[in-house]
From Swiss-Prot:
Entry function: Hormone regulating the release of corticotropin from pituitary gland. Induces NLRP6 in intestinal epithelial cells, hence may influence gut microbiota profile.
Recorded coiled-coil stretches: none
Residue stretch(es) of the prosequence: 25-148
Protein name: Corticoliberin
Signal peptide stretch: 1-24
Residue span of region Disordered: 115-153
Record-linked InterPro entries: Corticotropin-releasing_fac_CS, CRF, Urocortin_CRF
GO CC term (a single one): neuronal cell body
Subunit structure: Interacts (via C-terminus) with CRFR1 (via N-terminal extracellular domain).
Biased composition (Basic and acidic residues): 141-151
Main location: secreted
Highest taxon of source: Eukaryota
Amino acid sequence: MRLPLLVSAGVLLVALLPCPPCRALLSRGPVLGARQAPQHPQALDFLQPQQQPQQPQPRPVLLRMGEEYFLRLGNLNKSPAAPLSPASSPLTGSSGNRPDEVAANFFRALLQQLPLPRRPLDSPSGPAERGAENALSSRQEAPERERRSEEPPISLDLTFHLLREVLEMARAEQLAQQAHSNRKLMEIIGK
């Protein structure tokens, strides 16, 4: 009787005690990627309303596989480490950008992240060599195009069928993991 009471009291104490503030939340450096020591750390209190900072900082828009990809909504030719200007960020709530401009910049940034088509290693890489290659290969591509047009394209039904199969397999695996964890939990509680 005492042991479960002590364990539950300990869990409640750990859950309700204020945690030390996170360094990532405290640092408000001008560059997001740079690790800097906080100049004037403040303890974060989640029960009181947060004050709005005077100068809004840009935030990451996409997170993929633990890496941050920043959508540079201003000049997309800048280096990837260049910070967003506060006027160009849609998260700051500025009314300077029209929604269609923001959407156009968003899609342009997404297109930049798409992988480029790959070419064989033995193909020439210079623009003049590519022009000569295009002139020579245009004659060779005609039979290849005819062959490609004769092959039936992969139907969308097949694509969606394969997608459904993969999703069903993932769902079955998730249910198996859940059943395993439930069995372990029942063994622990039953003892």
